[in-house]
A protein has these predicted regions:
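A short beta-loop-alpha structural element at the N-terminal edge
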Residues: 6-23
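A short helix-loop-beta-strand connector motif used in the catalytic cores of GNAT acetyltransferases and
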Residues: 49-63, 84
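Conserved beta-strand-loop-alpha-helix junction that forms the acyl-donor binding cleft
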Residues: 95, 121-130, 147-152
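Conserved active-site tyrosine of GNAT-family acetyltransferases
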Residues: 25, 134, 139
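Conserved GNAT-fold acetyl-CoA-binding loop/helix
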Residues: 26-51
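Conserved beta-strand in the GNAT
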Residues: 63, 69-77, 84-89
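Conserved GNAT acetyl-CoA-binding A-motif
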Residues: 111-122
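Conserved acetyl-CoA-binding loop-helix of GNAT-fold acetyltransferases
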Residues: 90, 96-109, 132-136
Length: 161
């Protein structure tokens, strides 16, 4: 008898999954208060209602499930011939297994299908794994600014398509 490991797939999220996705963001950002400004961490931990509003209001949100649980997510929006990627999160219990890369690659592929001219992302330089992941996929730093509402410096990353 052979046992097969399931291959994770990226799927579009639905409003009925808002609670599971909000729980993922809570887990993914828990403990980051020691590294990042608390305002940034709290903003990255949306409520179920906020996630539901994303799904009903023009954002595309993709998820990865493992063992019946949402373990990764990324959000996309498409303003004026560009794509903005944000809210990339992976459950700490499954980090290091390529799920962040899988989600980011999916989002880049989605942007290509919309004929977006470029993709933008903002990443904290205090999250070197996130910065490295974006750079591995071809993103380059085109600016840095201090997000006053979060009290954190952020890198503006761009991937021309």
């Amino acid at each position: 008898m052979r046992f097969f490991r399931t291959t994770p797939r990226v799927l579009p999220s639905h409003p009925s999954e808002a609670e599971a996705i909000a729980d993922l963001y809570q887990r993914a950002w828990q403990g980051c208060e020691q590294l990042l400004d608390l305002r940034l961490v709290r903003d990255m931990q949306p409520s179920m209602g906020e996630v539901r509003s994303w799904l009903q209001g023009g954002f595309e949100l993709y998820r990865v499930e493992h063992g019946g649980h949402v373990v990764g997510a990324i959000r996309c929006t498409f303003p004026a011939s560009a794509c903005v990627l944000d809210r990339l999160a992976v459950d700490p219990a499954v980090r290091g297994q390529g799920l962040g890369r899988l989600l980011l690659e999916h989002a880049v592929s989605r942007a290509r299908r919309t004929a977006s001219g470029r993709i933008w992302a903002q990443v904290s330089p205090k999250l070197p794994a996130a910065v490295a992941l974006h750079r591995d996929l071809g993103f380059r730093t085109v600016g840095q600014h201090l997000a006053a509402y979060w009290g954190e410096p952020l890198l503006l990353l761009e991937l021309p398509l």
